[in-house]
């Protein structure tokens, strides 16, 4: 999670 949540991945 983290940047992946922002990117929607």
Swiss-Prot record:
- Which GO BP terms apply? defense response
Expressed, tissue-wise, as follows: Expressed by the skin dorsal glands.
Q: Which domain of life is it from?
A: Eukaryota
Q: How is it modified after translation?
A: Rubellidin 4.2 seems to differ from Rubellidin 4.3 by its C-terminal amidation.
- What taxonomic classification does the UniProt entry list for its organism? Eukaryota, Metazoa, Chordata, Craniata, Vertebrata
GO CC terms, sorted: extracellular region
Q: Which UniProt keywords apply?
A: Amidation, Amphibian defense peptide, Secreted
Q: Where are the transmembrane segments?
A: none
Role according to the record: Shows neither neuropeptide activity nor antibiotic activity.
Q: Cellular location of this protein?
A: Secreted
Protein name, per record: Rubellidin-4.2/4.3
Task: Give residue numbers for the modification (Leucine amide).
Answer: 9
State the organism of origin: Litoria rubella
